[in-house]
Design a protein with these regions (language model features):
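Short beta-strand micro-motifs within the conserved protein kinase catalytic domain, predominantly
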Residues: 1-10
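Structural motif in protein kinase domains
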Residues: 17-45
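Activation segment signature within eukaryotic-like protein kinase domains
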Residues: 60-61
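Catalytic-loop of the protein kinase fold
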Residues: 72-89
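Activation segment/activation loop of eukaryotic-type protein kinase catalytic domains
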Residues: 89-131, 136
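Conserved C-lobe activation region of Hanks-type protein kinase-like domains
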Residues: 134-158, 162-224
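Conserved C-terminal C-lobe helix
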Residues: 230-243
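Terminal C-lobe "cap" of eukaryotic-type protein kinase domains
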Residues: 244-249, 253-264
Length: 264
């Protein structure tokens, strides 16, 4: 098991089939600095090994794309892809050059819905939802139902993009408190990418718009420093396509799998 402690509670999590990516990647600890309470994020060995071993990073992302595509083609939209709902088993670490992911599972289908029943769409975790669901875009929902093969990946591939971006930035996107992060030996203070009090949809949407206008800037201080220039540029290009604000232009899972980032 692993646990998370905040000002009021201690949360224990027990998981079978692996540990969630969030549990492996971050440990969050509240502390006082100059009289102010901030949260310090400690990176897990898994996260460091993942970005230090490009072949395993590609394997993880490609496997998740294929898994989502498989689910979607069955007419099911997961609609709650996030770090807590991806379980990982692995062995070794980058220091010994034997890091390997052995199992990947997408869990928690409590928010999933059939593409022919769009009335079942929920927004349990709005920070990871795509803009068209965040804003309640009725045109998209109608097109999804009537022409589902074209737009069937739109919801889940956005959520996957945000999940991977969260790992890059080393900070849960929902954090709305001041957070201290250390990347490549440098200390940064920030908040989560979509963190806002009340988790209001319109505020999250505005942050989504800001993100899409400046992904390169957001990734300036990130774990991507561990990638070589070729992989870094190709990955950012793929991520931009996954996080395209216009759902009609957003990349499909199959096209993402065929992106140059995955070519050896």
């Amino acid at each position: 098991y692993y646990y998370y402690e905040d000002a009021n509670d201690i949360w224990f999590s027990f998981e079978k089939g692996g540990i969630s990516i969030s549990g492996l990647s971050f440990k969050i600890k509240g502390e006082f600095e100059k009289g102010e309470r901030i949260y310090f994020i400690q990176k897990g060995k898994f996260l460091i090994s993942l970005f230090s071993t490009i072949s395993q990073f590609k394997y993880l992302l490609k496997s998740l794309l294929l898994g989502i595509d498989y689910i979607n083609k069955k007419g099911i939209i997961h609609s709650d892809i996030k770090p807590e709902n991806i379980l990982i088993e692995h062995k070794g670490d980058s220091n010994e050059n034997n890091f390997k992911i052995t199992s990947i599972k997408i869990i928690d289908y409590g928010s999933a819905f059939n593409v022919n029943n769009t009335t079942a769409i929920s927004s349990n975790t709005p920070e990871y939802l795509c803009p068209e669901i965040t804003t309640g875009n009725k045109k998209f929902i109608k097109e999804l139902k009537n022409n589902n093969s074209r737009y069937i990946n739109c919801i889940d591939i956005w959520s996957l993009g945000i999940t991977i971006l969260e790992l890059c930035l080393c900070c849960p996107i929902w954090m709305n408190y001041k957070t201290k992060i250390i990347i490549n030996g440098k200390t940064y203070h920030s908040t989560g990418l979509f963190g806002c009090r009340g988790r209001e949809a319109n505020k999250i949407y505005q942050k989504q718009v800001e993100l899409c206008k400046g992904i390169n800037k957001k990734l300036k201080n990130s774990m991507l420093y561990l990638f070589d220039q070729y992989d870094r540029e190709n990955f950012i290009d793929l991520l931009k396509k996954m996080l395209e604000l216009d759902y009609k232009k957003r990349i499909s899972c199959q096209d993402a799998v065929n992106h140059p980032f995955f070519s050896d």
